[in-house]
């Protein structure tokens, strides 16, 4: 084989390796397929058919395949957080959801931010004060047949990421679903690459950006920390997320009530903090 043929063969192998991976599966609840559920890999999107089946060409760099949990449903929880995602390690991934409230019905949403326990005393206060209070409020709503969930808006820990298993155990004791958001202190400070620095967070909590529905409302969770390593970061949204949001908004009705959840403030007084375009400009 001459050098030219070797070169073309190498290009062909590179092209084949860069091809998207076809992923198939079903989204189910109560033994039946759920139609028109949005499925994504963090780049591309698909809608489930009438029998709940989907097919999506997953990006080769995708970490997960996951669903936009529809109104009236909830994914099973592990350590208190909904597992609406599957690690991309097979060609087929099914999802089992369960009923949670009613489609378009009432619900209660609570929010907490910057729990970031640094030492034993901080963990003790979370475990004996803050988390029990959150549980009590959630149970008060549920006693009125109003489903409840909470959103933790980042800095779940304070750089001590070896404590992720412990804090997940404590989150589970709240006994209501907790949707997580990644903060700057939830990144691995030893890693300077933004995507790679979230590896431990993804292991315990799943995607760093995603969406779900509750009642008549639409929620988008974003990672607006551009991590540089060694506790250094900028506030902004990378192009991958902005493109994902732009594509996702085609599934959100115009005029819908939309919540965007992220760790760092989007505005400080009259100053726009983003180093990247505003998500408002994606539609």
State the predicted function of each range.
Residues 22, 71-165:
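N-terminal active-site segment of His-dependent metallophosphoesterases
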Residues 71-76, 162-254:
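Extended active-site neighborhood of metal-dependent phosphoesterases/phosphodiesterases
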Residues 61-75:
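A short, solvent-exposed beta-strand micro-motif common in secreted/extracellular proteins
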Residues 21-23, 29-43:
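Short, ordered, surface-exposed loop/turn motifs in non-cytosolic proteins
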Residues 252-270:
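Short acidic, glycine-rich surface-loop motifs adjacent to enzyme active sites
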Residues 23-30, 52, 95, 275:
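A short, amphipathic beta-strand motif
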Residues 274-283:
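Single conserved hydrophobic/aromatic residue that forms the stacking wall/gate
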Residues 40-57:
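Short, acidic Ser/Thr/Gly-rich low-complexity loop/linker segments typical of extracellular
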């Amino acid at each position: 084989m001459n050098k030219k043929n070797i070169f073309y063969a190498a290009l062909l192998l590179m092209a084949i390796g860069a091809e998207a991976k076809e992923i198939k599966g079903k989204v189910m609840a109560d033994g039946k397929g759920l139609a028109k559920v949005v499925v994504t890999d963090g780049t591309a999107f698909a809608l489930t058919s009438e029998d709940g089946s989907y097919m999506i060409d997953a990006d080769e760099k995708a970490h997960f395949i996951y669903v936009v949990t529809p109104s009236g449903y909830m994914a099973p929880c592990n350590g208190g957080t909904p597992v609406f995602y599957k690690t991309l390690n097979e060609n087929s991934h099914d999802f089992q959801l369960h009923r949670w409230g009613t489609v378009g019905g009432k619900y209660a949403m609570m929010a907490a931010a910057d729990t970031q326990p640094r030492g034993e005393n901080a963990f003790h206060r979370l475990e004996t004060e803050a988390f029990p209070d959150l549980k009590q409020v959630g149970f008060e709503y549920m006693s009125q047949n109003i489903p409840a969930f909470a959103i933790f808006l980042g800095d779940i820990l304070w750089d001590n990421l070896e404590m992720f298993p412990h804090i997940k155990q404590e989150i589970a004791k709240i006994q209501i679903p907790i949707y997580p958001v990644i903060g700057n202190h939830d990144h691995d400070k030893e890693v300077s690459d933004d995507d790679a620095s979230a590896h431990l967070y993804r292991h315990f909590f799943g995607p760093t950006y995603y969406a779900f529905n509750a009642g008549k409302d639409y929620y988008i969770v974003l990672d607006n920390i551009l991590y540089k390593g060694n506790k250094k970061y900028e506030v902004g949204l990378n192009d991958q997320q902005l493109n994902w949001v732009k594509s996702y908004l085609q599934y959100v009705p115009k005029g819908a009530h939309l919540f965007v959840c992220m760790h760092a403030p989007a505005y400080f007084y009259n100053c726009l903090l983003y180093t990247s375009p505003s998500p408002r400009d994606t539609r």
